[in-house]
């Protein structure tokens, strides 16, 4: 009887013994991959579906170039991108000028490592609904026409959709109180364009590259909305890398990431698609000191304490 019981017990335990190590190994492999995954993100300055598509493609490219798993993690708003970078949930982030400064001030050792060719000479656009009767102008003094009009920015933390437009408005002698009602905050550039196009606001401030892309794809009704003024140039978007990647991947990861961006070649179809999605001709080096003007304006306007 005892022999029968022991035989039955062995038959029960043998499959478990065979399966358990494999299950543990699989779990450890998945856990190791997750721990080694480079998490990338971006401020949500455009339609979330467009962002998901472009950064998924970029993640695939970076994974191949860097030899480590790379995953794009979307965030809900600009401040969430800064917070996620601060706590290390995101390690490589596409920030605007303002959010990049905010992030680096909260993470000592973080570095701006790359920007598009257009980002060292970036511009905002003031756009208007044509029924507003406001005519395009060539000088900053023309902004005085906006007094008593309805106006919307993009995100509250946007460089091209809020910070620099407000700075230029102040240079022209306008305060937010000079607009009709309260100045709006649409949340992103696409929404600003649609709100002005619909006549919800007379005027809005938008990112020049987003405007160009949407007009090229005929997503804007130019019979209803037009550009009033193009601002002077300033430094804007850039990639910022978290200092924790040195311990996780080695001291040379930042240089490898830079090389991957600089390697993007419009003559290579796969690369051209990524560059088109990111609205770039190429990527170039940058450094933290390039954003000193943005930091100064941010402190002046109260967006940086």
Please identify what each model-predicted range represents.
Residues 20-21, 33-57, 234, 240-241, ...:
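An extracytoplasmic/periplasmic, membrane-proximal ligand-sensing/linker region
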Residues 72-83, 96-98, 176-194:
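Short helix-initiation/N-cap motifs at beta->coil->alpha
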């Amino acid at each position: 009887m005892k022999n029968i019981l022991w035989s039955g017990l062995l038959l029960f335990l043998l499959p478990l013994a065979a399966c358990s190590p494999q299950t543990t190994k699989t779990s450890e492999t998945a856990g190791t991959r997750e721990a080694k995954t480079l998490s990338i993100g971006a401020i949500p300055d455009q339609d979330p579906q467009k962002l998901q598509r472009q950064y998924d493609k970029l993640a695939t490219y970076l994974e191949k170039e860097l030899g480590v798993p790379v995953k794009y993690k979307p965030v809900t708003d600009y401040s969430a991108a800064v917070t996620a970078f601060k706590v290390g949930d995101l390690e490589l982030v596409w920030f605007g000028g303002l959010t990049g400064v905010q992030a680096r001030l909260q993470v000592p050792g973080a570095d701006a490592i790359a920007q598009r060719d257009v980002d060292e000479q970036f511009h905002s656009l003031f756009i208007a609904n044509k029924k507003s009767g406001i005519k395009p102008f060539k000088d900053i003094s023309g902004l005085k026409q906006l007094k008593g009009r309805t106006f919307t920015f993009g995100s509250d933390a946007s460089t091209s959709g809020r910070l620099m437009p407000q700075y230029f408005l102040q240079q022209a002698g306008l305060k937010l109180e000079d607009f009709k009602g309260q100045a709006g905050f649409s949340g992103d550039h696409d929404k600003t364009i649609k709100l002005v196009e619909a006549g919800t606001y007379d005027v809005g401030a938008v990112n020049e590259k987003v405007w160009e892309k949407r007009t090229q794809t005929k997503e804007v009704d130019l019979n209803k909305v037009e550009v009033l003024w193009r601002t002077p140039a300033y430094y804007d978007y850039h990639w910022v890398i978290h200092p924790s990647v040195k311990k996780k991947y080695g001291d040379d990861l930042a240089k490898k990431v830079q090389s991957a961006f600089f390697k993007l070649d419009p003559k290579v179809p796969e690369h051209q698609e990524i560059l088109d999605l990111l609205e770039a001709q190429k990527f170039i080096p940058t450094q933290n000191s390039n954003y000193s003007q943005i930091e100064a304006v941010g402190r002046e306007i109260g967006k940086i304490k």
